[in-house]
């Protein structure tokens, strides 16, 4: 403001009776127009406006705001008004009307009047995250902050496959497949830099996404498509081989149990500095994904020419039941905690109730009916409307110590944090995976529910999934936020639009609806 912007901005406004254009630069134009009402030009500059969201995130909450004027419209009962906006497009303001807009950008509503059906709304939302990277496609993990992350992109592909977007799915898998090296896949891609490979689940999600794709296609042709100098099939074999022998970054199969050791902060619960959910050892969802990968490997290499997949497959399934069940509670430990080199049989069970065990049901790694029921019954405690909490609000037997500059941030014996707000290192990070509710994992609960209860559980699962309508209609309309507070009233937090939140909701919605 003190450089003169408050004096310059009013001169950058061009108006007519229905709206205005704001052009701060020749390549940047904002057009806003009202349908029935009028625009009143009345420029105002407000100094040091307090913004509560920035304050909640521990950022500078005060900044100046500029308003060019206001819209005025007289409405009778039952009437509605539309305000339409575009950025650097639709330069002819006369064309800025509902009829002139592409179908996918017209006003949004869900299951109400002329609104969209749930699956239509979710399919539309998927396209917002697909981007070009070179000759292939990639996925923006979330707006406004994230880029293309390996784990998120590969989970997102499952929703694309469910939506019938097979070509896009293939190109994304080829994009990440070409980066596979010694059983690892990038955690994220920054320009041409794919050096960050601190993820034990991204290679396994790659296998799961490939399995979904060939299942939907009804053939294995995609596995023979070229990805650089190799085929997708060879890349999957490479992942299986190095999971067993060990990757350069420390992921390795325990030969005694067949389970996969994951270094600290290599799962989706990867918050670090301070270490909030290290999960070093044998995390349950990694074992479920490994089980599913072995099923795929056995399918595409039934004679075991590339490895003894079938024997390890049986070993993993038996080891999960033998080592993960908490005898007192009847559901699964979140992780068998151990340092590198310690066999799973000597690891310590982490009794924290988290939703990761749901993948043991959805991936088919646990099929014992009683255990599966115990899992979904326990995880029901974690549900909030449209999301599932990352940790139960209850004491834990195995303490979780979160320290920052020699200061303990939360009670190690009850680490649940129900509000995601405040300073990043001392407040938000400890809460991120320790009570914050996540949208992407919520559909997995509903998927597990129908796995356990079959057709009889369909209506209940659809009712739970339907609680996401509120999220689609609030915040970033037509999208699903990244996270919510674990505590009531479950305020939306994090990214306003999260790729895997949309894709998983669509995938499971279609799956459950088809039962």
Annotate each language-model stretch with its function:
Residues 1-515:
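Acidic, mature catalytic/reactive cores of soluble proteins
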């Amino acid at each position: 403001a003190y450089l003169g912007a408050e004096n310059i901005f009013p001169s950058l406004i061009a108006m007519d009776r229905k709206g205005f254009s704001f052009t701060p630069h020749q390549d940047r134009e904002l057009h806003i127009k009202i349908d029935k009402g009028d625009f009143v030009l009345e420029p105002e500059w407000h100094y040091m406006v307090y913004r509560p969201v920035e304050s909640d995130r521990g950022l500078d909450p005060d900044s100046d705001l500029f308003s060019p004027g206001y819209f005025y419209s007289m409405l009778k009962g039952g009437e509605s008004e539309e305000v339409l906006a575009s950025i650097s497009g639709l330069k002819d303001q006369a064309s800025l009307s509902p009829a002139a807009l592409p179908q996918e950008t017209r006003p949004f509503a869900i299951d109400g009047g002329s609104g969209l059906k749930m699956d239509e709304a979710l399919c539309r939302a998927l396209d917002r995250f697909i981007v070009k990277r070179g000759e292939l496609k990639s996925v923006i993990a979330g707006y406004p902050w994230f880029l293309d992350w390996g784990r998120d992109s590969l989970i997102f592909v499952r929703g694309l496959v469910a939506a019938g977007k097979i070509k896009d799915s293939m190109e994304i898998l080829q994009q990440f497949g070409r980066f596979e090296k010694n059983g690892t896949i990038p955690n994220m891609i920054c320009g041409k830099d794919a050096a960050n490979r601190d993820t034990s689940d991204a290679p396994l999600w790659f296998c799961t996404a490939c399995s979904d794709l060939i299942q939907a296609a009804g053939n294995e042709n995609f596995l023979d498509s070229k990805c650089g100098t190799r085929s997708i099939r060879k890349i999957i074999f490479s992942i299986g081989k190095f999971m067993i022998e060990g990757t350069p970054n420390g992921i390795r199969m325990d030969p005694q149990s067949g389970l996969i050791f994951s270094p600290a902060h290599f799962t989706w619960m990867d918050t670090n500095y301070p270490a909030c959910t290290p999960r070093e050892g044998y995390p349950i969802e990694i074992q479920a994904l490994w089980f599913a990968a072995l099923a795929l490997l056995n399918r595409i290499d039934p004679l075991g020419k590339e490895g003894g997949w079938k024997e390890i497959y049986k070993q993993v399934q038996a080891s999960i039941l033998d080592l993960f069940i908490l005898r007192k509670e009847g559901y699964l430990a979140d992780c068998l905690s151990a340092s590198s080199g310690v066999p799973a049989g000597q690891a310590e069970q982490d009794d924290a109730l988290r939703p990761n065990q749901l993948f043991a049901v959805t991936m088919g790694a646990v099929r014992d009916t009683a255990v599966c029921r115990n899992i979904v019954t326990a995880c029901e405690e974690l549900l909030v409307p449209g999301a599932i909490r990352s940790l139960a609000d209850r004491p834990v037997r195995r303490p979780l110590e979160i320290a920052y500059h020699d200061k303990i941030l939360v009670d190690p014996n009850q680490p649940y944090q129900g509000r995601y707000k405040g300073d990043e290192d001392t407040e938000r990070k400890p809460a991120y995976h320790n009570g914050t509710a996540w949208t992407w994992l919520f559909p997995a609960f509903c998927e597990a529910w129908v796995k356990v209860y079959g057709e009889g559980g369909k209506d209940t699962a659809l009712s739970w999934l339907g609680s996401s309508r509120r999220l689609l209609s609030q915040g970033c309309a037509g999208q699903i936020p990244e996270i919510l507070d674990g505590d009531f009233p479950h305020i939306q937090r994090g990214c306003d639009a999260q790729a895997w939140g949309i894709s998983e909701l669509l995938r499971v919605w279609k799956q459950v609806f088809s039962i």
